[in-house]
Amino acid sequence: MALSWNEIKNRAINFSKEWEKEQREHAESQSFWNDFFNIFGISRKRVASFEEPVKKLGEQRGRIDLFWKGTLLVEHKSRGKDLAKAYTQAMDYFPGLKEAELPKYILISDFETFKLYDLEEDKNYEFTLNELYKNVHLFGFIAGYTKHKVVAEDPINIQAAQMMGKLHDKLKDVGYDGHPLELFLVRLLFLGFAEDTSIFEKRAFLEFLENKTSEDGSDLGSKLTELFQVLNTPFEKRLKNLDESLATFPYVNGKLFEEFLPIPSFDSKMREILLECCYLDWSKISPAIFGSLFQSIMDKEHRRNLGAHYTSEANILKLIRPLFLDELYEKFEKVKKNKKQLAEFHKELSTLHFLDPACGSGNFLIIAYRELRILELEILKILYSENVLDISSIVWCDVDQFHGIEVEEFPAQIAQVAMWLIDHQMNMMISEHFGQYFVRLPLKKSANIVHANSLQISWEDVISKEKLTYILGNPPFIGKKEQNKEQKDDMVRIFNKVQGAGVLDYVTAWYLKASKYIQNTKIKVAFVSTNSIVQGEQVGILWKELFSNYGIKIHFAHQT
């Protein structure tokens, strides 16, 4: 669990007092850095090594003073030495490092002065030992307060999708297929994310793989099965002699690790792929890309038949802003100077409920929830000081306000896990602002994702219309010629005796079903759809039915 910022600042002050007179580069430098990591409640041994050998240009060899692979490179000098030269020396090590090992930060110190280089943001900072306590926020990446910008277009999202796709193919090739494979991959997605976002202790999963499994991969499947069981077991029910490498993992709950799966068989190459996945910085991965991740794993024929397609974040925002977000921000601006009204508005946010009746892997629900939580944080900044005692008591919006229906099991599983992940990212954002570590473990609430054919079940069985506020999503576009027998039967069932309905796209069934569902309510609906339903022969059939028989009104529309 991450320390509070107040505790970190106090430790930094004590650290500065203890080390203010040290001058020698080699004599005490390792103790210095061990104590430095302890400021943030992290064991240096767990994440970084001293004197890491590395090959330099021209066949020369060197040793990095302190190296945390993929995160931090430290060069340490005696007091008064040239720190600019030390930075050049640090950069000279880069050609000898693997892509996954390249650090995001370089830190130079001579006991008295610190120079931190943020390579991703292209920024650098300089301060003295006595000023360290004022600058500890710069080291949030050590403490667990990760401030990465999560960008949907970040190349790491594509890397993650490709690597998980490789692992999927390898497991499928050896006969590990169907539901066990799908759930197994979903669990690995959670583990990768938990590794880099302070759900687990830093490097706990990677260290478990590197140190507790054989290089040939022969025992990897059984070791992962053992880990899954530990993650599903409360601390008080675990064996007293449980291996220390497993005992540190938290109790997750949420039923994610509840089902016992067949043990998969790995080889050295498959183990290597999994390790490469772990070397990625999963804190930078957007849960909203899990849809494209899912698509990268499906074969093309399967994807075409499902009508699956990934909607960009920009297009999702074009839908949710006029549907509900713009209105909520307008209300926020009106009430933010009146704390009583603002508190009532905060309560209102926690009562909103959202349904995506064709949710896929949850892109719309994820982004809608993220935006709701961002607005909630703006409210909390006004209502509460940064010294609030327990931030868990003031965060009211939660994943159980979000509901989805998905015909395929795998994306339904991904959607539920992705909602937990975006929830954790939002909790880290709030932790950063209030200076407290806030994590919802064990998992007690979850998004209500139902695995079913949305056109064959009653939506009221998922959520009652009295409770629901908004319907949104991206139902599948499948033209009349591409529809299979089950889809044609769905169309007949939904449109019943509507004349000419045989020419309609499959997506129109969601329009009619939603129109029936929202009768005599204030529920608003917005879908992304093919433009064929607003031009040509489909217009007179679909919209006449919606306007004449259900009183539907169009509030907004966009062309993409």
Which functions belong to the PLM regions below?
Residues N10-N14, W68-K69, D299, I394-D398, ...:
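Surface-exposed beta-strand-to-loop junctions
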Residues F36-I39, G96, L191-D196, P322, ...:
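Active-site catalytic microenvironments for nucleophilic, acid-base chemistry
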Residues E22, K56-G62, R79, L83, ...:
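Signature of N6-adenine DNA methyltransferases within the class I
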Residues K170-K172, D398-I405, Q519, K524-V528:
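Conserved alpha/beta enzyme-core scaffolds, especially Rossmann-like or related mixed alpha/beta domains
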Residues K69, E101, K347, L352, ...:
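Structured loop/turn residues at beta-strand edges in well-structured enzyme cores
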Residues V47-F50, A204-F208, K331-S350, L372-Q401, ...:
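Flexible phosphate/Mg2+-sensing switch loops adjacent to catalytic phosphate-binding sites
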